[in-house]
From Swiss-Prot:
It comes from the Archaea. It comes from Methanopyrus kandleri (strain AV19 / DSM 6324 / JCM 9639 / NBRC 100938). Residues 109-134 are annotated as: Disordered. InterPro entries: Ribosomal_Su5_D2-typ_SF, Ribosomal_uS9, Ribosomal_uS9_archaeal, Ribosomal_uS9_CS, Ribsml_uS5_D2-typ_fold_subgr. GO terms for biological process: maturation of SSU-rRNA from tricistronic rRNA transcript (SSU-rRNA, 5.8S rRNA, LSU-rRNA); translation. Keywords: Ribonucleoprotein, Ribosomal protein. The lineage of its organism: Archaea, Methanobacteriati, Methanobacteriota, Methanomada group, Methanopyri. One of its GO terms (cellular component) is cytosolic small ribosomal subunit. Coiled coil: none annotated. Residues 115-134 have a biased composition (Basic residues). Belongs to the universal ribosomal protein uS9 family. This is Small ribosomal subunit protein uS9. Pfam families: Ribosomal_S9. GO terms for molecular function: RNA binding; structural constituent of ribosome.
Length: 134
């Protein structure tokens, strides 16, 4: 059995778990090949760390990502974080880490923004009911 690296990525309420093992470059998200994922915007987000890493690194590994929770874009960004962290851990290459950080810091560090809780007296976190009209 070869080497296996497990990493996680979170975005809003979406959680992704990536398993990276020796292989021939297969990338699957929820058991579906990455090149058939729709919408295209989500597919491009997931492909970003693979493109930056380069074909020579990606062709040596198989990546399986399981994502749950959140919306389709949050799931794509969570998968992207998990893949990027996994490839950095797999290669142990500080240059790859620097390339990810230069492209987008949130690819490795995550994005701390969360939904603000709703308060009483209005429809949302900040919106209030109208006091009077005329």
């Amino acid at each position: 059995m070869g080497r296996v690296v497990q990493t996680t990525g979170k975005r809003k309420t979406a959680i992704a778990r990536a398993v990276i093992r020796e292989g021939e470059g297969r990338v699957r998200v929820n058991k579906r090949p990455v090149n058939i994922i729709e919408p295209e915007m989500a597919r491009m987000k997931i492909m970003e760390p693979l493109i930056i890493a380069g074909e020579d690194i990606v062709s040596q590994v198989d990546i399986d990502v399981k994502v749950q929770g959140g919306g389709w874009m949050s799931q794509a960004e969570a998968a992207r974080i998990a893949i990027a962290r996994g490839l950095v851990e797999w290669t142990g290459d500080p240059d790859l880490r620097d390339a990810y950080m230069a492209y987008d810091r949130h690819m490795l560090k995550g994005d701390p923004r969360r939904k603000e809780p709703k308060k009483f007296g209005g429809r949302g976190a900040r919106a209030r009911r109208q006091k009077s009209y005329r």
